[in-house]
Amino acid sequence: MSLSNKLSVKDLDVSGKRVFIRVDFNVPLDGKTITNNQRIVAALPTIKYVLENKPKAVILASHLGRPNGEKVDKFSLAPVASELEKLLGKKVNFLDDCVGDNVEKAVNGGSDGEVFLLENLRFHIEEEGSQKKDGEKVKASGEDVKKFRQQLTNLADVYVNDAFGTAHRAHSSMVGLELPQKAAGFLMAKELEYFAKALENPVRPFLAILGGAKVSDKIQLIDNLLDKVDLLIVGGGMSFTFKKVLDNMPIGDSLFDEAGAKNVENLVAKAKKNNVKIVLPVDFITADKFDKDAKTSTATEDEGIPDNWMGLDAGPKSNELFAKTVAEAKTIVWNGPPGVFEFDNFAKGTKSLLDAAVKSAESGNTVIIGGGDTATVAKKYGVVDKLSHVSTGGGASLELLEGKELPGVVAISDKK
């Protein structure tokens, strides 16, 4: 799967055509009120670009929440239609389903770039391919899925995918439209461009920064990255498992991952073989309980963490060491914070690392933040625009970094 050779919306001739855009309008709702419209705003450049190029109609499709394959009013995309109308300054026709005769009739009657927003794709079991019933997974029949995909295909002449956050799912709207041209929207294209920069052709030294709790969740990630990077910072809860296994450091009540511990020595041996320098924290900010108001103390790697205490952040010496490592790198991918940044007393390590990452990006290096918690950190401190790229897809970016193919990306046409 090449990331750098995919058809882009800019390569399409959309004039007079029905353009189906798979967007990510999975926004947080309080009742019928959208509490954060960022995902809608993020899709505007692709929608506006298509509209400027004189299509017959633009058909927007998304999921919202987890309705589990049936119609659930609180997951309706109706509130999104009125928000989108405001943001676009153009009428948006909201349709109360995403497939079927009425939908086809409406869309085919569209002209002069009329905009249609389909109802939540996941109101149909065929979108995800299964639903949970009484705790059991029930699959949609192959026939029904095929029919649903054909009905979606009937709505369009060309297909654009701008939903990177769902790219790791082989859902019908991501992989099932059989059209001659399937292109990446601007959001998707930017994600692919930056991940290609890191994974296919990095400027070296290439550094990966990994945090998060469990080693066992990240084994495939570490294993894949050890074939690509020159430097690896392991921080967060995961670092205690490394410190205990490698240095026999006492870790008190800090996180210890029994399952992951079995792999630490293999991973370190692979790093040695591949000449990858692994950087671990050397001191810690500790707490007497997992709580924002916990008593705090410090510990060095030599003394270790006493019983009944736990490490919740990297200490000042580790922060210096991490900043120095960041300063050596020309390409950086960061997935997972080095401390419990949600609690102010344990956010210094994360803030310090973020400052170093911003400094690196400002001096012209490529700094990519994987989605999830690390993206939340970048937003919290208001530095999203100061970094090269903050991914919109936690799960999708993780799977890319693990070396997996993303079905939604594979489905996009390659440039001829």
From Swiss-Prot:
Gene3D superfamilies in alphabetical order: Phosphoglycerate kinase, N-terminal domain (3.40.50.1260)
Q: Which residues cross the membrane?
A: none
What pathway annotation does it carry? Carbohydrate degradation; glycolysis; pyruvate from D-glyceraldehyde 3-phosphate: step 2/5
Cross-referenced InterPro entries: Phosphoglycerate_kinase, Phosphoglycerate_kinase_CS, Phosphoglycerate_kinase_N, Phosphoglycerate_kinase_sf
Which residues does ATP bind?
Answer: 213, 218, 237, 311, 342, 373-374
Reaction catalyzed: (2R)-3-phosphoglycerate + ATP = (2R)-3-phospho-glyceroyl phosphate + ADP
Assembly information from the UniProt record: Monomer.
The protein in question is named Phosphoglycerate kinase
Name the gene for this chain.
PGK1
